[in-house]
Amino acid sequence: DAISIDEVHLDMDDDCKYALVIQDFHTGDPIDLLRSRRTSVTEPYFVSIPATERNQVKYLISDMYNPYIAYVEKYFPNAVPVVDSFHVIQWITRSIDNYVRQLLKKYRQHDREYQDKLSYEQQRPVSLPPSDEVYLLQKYRWLILSNQSNIRYHSDPRMDSHFHVLMNTYDYEDALFRIDPNLKDFRDLKEMYVQFNSRNGGNPLLARNELKELIQTYKSSRNFEHFRNRFLFATRQTPVLNGITDYNPVAYYEEDDF
């Protein structure tokens, strides 16, 4: 009653770059392998399967590739799309990294403009070290992107070559959060999802209740809307995450909204 859809890069020829892998979600056994994920290949294949068989599928597990999610509406009317947790956390981490990179780009631009200003005023080339923001975002953004359980925090201070003061891991983390408060919100949300998965992987009822509490906690956050809709529901009107079937519809967002 649950199948997984994914692609594998083969690049055998122009018509066989990404093959489509169909698996039994419970056993992991392959059901079939299609030479391409193109509609011209997948549509005739799925349509050829008797409707009585397709109607027995309750869950379609995939990444956030919208054409895969659309298979539910087109071929599996009794199923709900499910985004696997690996791709959810991958999307969250990538989104946070993109946000950090935009901050880094902004502060680098500030550095260049300030350096140009000094060079003009002094009528000679001026070279400046990176600003505190650029230094932190460039060298320590891993503190935000990594799972906290994988970070080895050290409390013993060490001399920092940029700030010329003794600092430990907690100091760098606090300094990053002072650059932009959103960074802490995003990191905390990521950690809530990681912990949610580790606690509730085998208990749908507990997962459903905690998910509701998580949503309640963050529903008033001005930064949470885009995260919530994509990270839980992958741009569909009523998809389900991790097979939880008691869900609430959410606003639909197009790709351009992100």
Regions found by a protein language model. Give the residues of each.
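Two-metal-ion RNase H-like nuclease active-site motif
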Residues: 1-12
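Catalytic cores of nucleotide-enabled group-transfer and carboxylate-activating enzymes in metabolic
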Residues: 8, 81-82
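Flexible glycine-/small-residue-rich
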Residues: 7-9, 22-25
